[in-house]
Design a protein with these regions (language model features):
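Enzyme catalytic cores with a strong preference for nitrogen-chemistry domains
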Residues: 1-299, 312-316, 326, 351
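ATP/NTP-dependent adenylation/nucleotidyl-transfer catalytic domains that generate, transfer
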Residues: 146, 212-213, 238, 264-302, ...
Length: 562
């Protein structure tokens, strides 16, 4: 049996458009001799559809799309894809997350998802009931009955010693052992997080060893709001060797012959910084495209955060579709302006300049009487940021551009950002990257190791992009004379590990103090994190690249202790 792995990039809620994607993939697979096409979880809906699943009209549209696929599928070809299935009663939730087999003339549900993730960004128990039977499909082909084990995404995540935690009960992989499948097909929609590609392989290898058969893992690709799906679908032999590896961060379709003895190939994972870069580019490109934007705008300060966002935007949308605005104040250094213009020239993006000194003076004059004097201190600093935010929003509004916020995760965590100022934007591209991660990624981008990746992304392959001057400059908001971030915050090399422990590892200040962290520092950082919650509630959506981001999976109260 020849299987095609269809790694598609769906648009959430576009059931007819996604059906067309699947049909095109099936026709291509048919020309390559495939007999079964395997598509991702909820392939017709796009993952995650969230409350779109509750709309009766869209449920009817899914049935119409499945009927259309059955009518137009090439003869002799079958399609296995993820669908939602209506439960036989009205008890809520009234859906199953399921897999359906489509063949010429009809379709039927053949498996239901057993383990429903309801943690972090996942909320499947809001919509779905769990299945209660292992998924096994028998297909006759070439005089042989193929026994195909089927599970859906989370059903594979059952190895506690690999996953690091037991998030739910049940063992769908173990329950298939007695059924002796010839193959295990896993339909996935697994979003990117740093280090996750290796974990997927380890989980698949564990399942292949337990079942004594190959694992076919088909993942979604593309950006859907904050989640970016990195693809990387694969076939793994029972030995744990990778037999087939699909592309990372782009759609792909490849055919594998299950009747041949699985031969492992050398298929190393991409460099972590390369995969992070390509994932961020994909997330930005798809967010813009799926929201109807062709062009983007950002403020360019001469600092490393806005420089990285400019690189990502040029790669995602093309240099000709990116505009950078310089908004120097009396406190902006000549070096920052020069560095910004040099960066824009290296990237080939357009620039504009609007000095803000006159606008600052206008605000000072307007506020002089009610404040009994000119704004000072933090008020004056925030006014500069809000002036810049207003200018950027005006240009983006007038010119139909997507405004990109350039703040990083460290700033969002401790509130070192200004509401209605530098937080303005439609997407916080690097809002899940700590400052130290920004420095590390920019250093990799400027290294010879990134040349091939840069060329593939449409960027100059030779020379520096971000530039040494920007990479080595001490971080500064330049809102007052001789300002440095370290005037207000601990050094990022000290701050970021603390933030990661508090956010991703959910450790308490007391635990950190017990392991040697300075008590005053731990309490201070925890206090900053807690008090900044009201700002994060109003922040632009970001691209999630860590195990815990300030997005839909971060559900902290604003008015709270702890």
């Amino acid at each position: 049996m020849r299987l095609a792995l269809a790694q598609i990039n769906p648009l959430v809620g576009d059931l007819s458009g996604n059906a067309a994607l699947l049909l095109a993939a099936c026709r291509t697979a048919h020309t390559q001799g495939a007999e079964l096409v395997v598509a991702p979880e909820l392939a017709l809906w796009g993952y995650p559809p969230r409350d779109l699943l509750l709309r009766p009209a869209l449920r009817r549209r899914q049935v119409e799309a499945l009927d259309q696929l059955a009518a137009e599928l090439p003869s002799g070809l079958a399609l296995l894809l993820g669908v939602s299935e209506a439960a036989p009663d009205r008890q809520q939730p009234d859906l199953f997350n399921a897999a359906a087999l489509v063949q010429s003339g009809g379709w039927r549900v053949v498996a239901r998802k057993r383990l429903l993730p309801s943690y972090d960004v996942f909320d499947e128990r809001r919509y779905f009931r769990p299945g209660d039977q292992p998924g096994l499909l028998e297909l006759e082909h070439g005089g042989r009955c193929w026994r195909l084990g089927i599970n859906i995404c989370e059903d594979l995540w059952v190895e506690e010693e690999l996953h690091g935690q037991r998030l739910r009960g049940g063992d769908p992989v173990g329950e298939l052992q007695a059924l002796r499948p010839d193959l295990l097909l896993n339909l996935s929609a697994s979003p990117f997080a740093q280090g996750k590609a290796q974990l997927r392989r380890r989980l698949a290898a564990a399942a292949a060893a337990r079942l004594g058969c190959p694992v076919v893992y088909v993942n979604q690709v593309g950006g859907n709001d904050e989640l970016v799906f990195d693809g990387g679908s694969f076939v793994m032999a029972a030995s744990g060797a990778v037999c087939l590896q699909l592309a990372w961060a782009e759609p792909d379709l490849q055919v594998w012959d299950a009747a041949l003895a699985p031969a492992g190939t050398t298929s190393p994972l991409p460099d972590p910084e390369e995969l992070l870069l390509r994932t961020l580019v994909l997330g930005l490109r798809d967010y813009a495209r799926k929201c109807g934007f062709r062009r983007a705008l950002l403020g360019l300060s001469g600092g490393i955060d806005s420089a990285l966002v400019a690189v990502l935007a040029a790669a995602a949308l093309g240099p000709g579709n990116v505009q950078a605005l310089l908004m120097p104040s009396p406190w902006s250094s000549a070096g920052s302006i020069e560095d910004s213009l040099a960066l824009a020239q290296r990237l080939g993006i357009a620039t504009g300049t609007v000095p803000i000194a006159a606008l600052m003076a206008g605000f000072d004059a307007a506020l002089n009487e009610p404040l009994a004097g000119a704004p000072a201190g933090l008020t004056a600093e925030n006014l500069q940021s809000r002036i810049r935010g207003t200018l950027l929003m005006a240009l983006a509004n007038q010119q139909g551009q997507l405004l990109l916020s350039t703040g990083n995760k460290s700033e969002l965590a401790v509130g070192y950002c200004t509401l209605y100022g530098d937080m303005n934007g439609g997407l916080a591209v690097i809002g899940d990257l700590y400052k130290t991660s920004v420095f590390r990624l920019c250093a990799w981008i400027d290294s010879p190791a990134a040349a091939a990746c840069r060329q593939a992304l449409g960027l100059a392959a030779e020379g520096e992009l971000v530039g040494r001057a920007i990479r080595e400059k001490p971080p500064s908001a330049e809102l007052r004379p001789d300002q440095r971030d370290s005037d207000s915050l601990p050094d990022y090399d000290q701050l970021d590990p603390l933030l990661k422990a508090l956010i991703e590892e959910q450790r308490s200040p007391e635990e950190l103090i017990a392991t040697g962290t300075d008590a005053a520092l731990a309490e201070r950082v925890q206090g900053l994190l807690r008090r900044a919650e009201f700002k994060r509630r109003q922040a632009a959506p970001l691209l999630k690249v860590s195990n815990r981001a300030f997005g839909s999976g971060w559900r902290m109260p604003i008015a709270a202790a702890g």
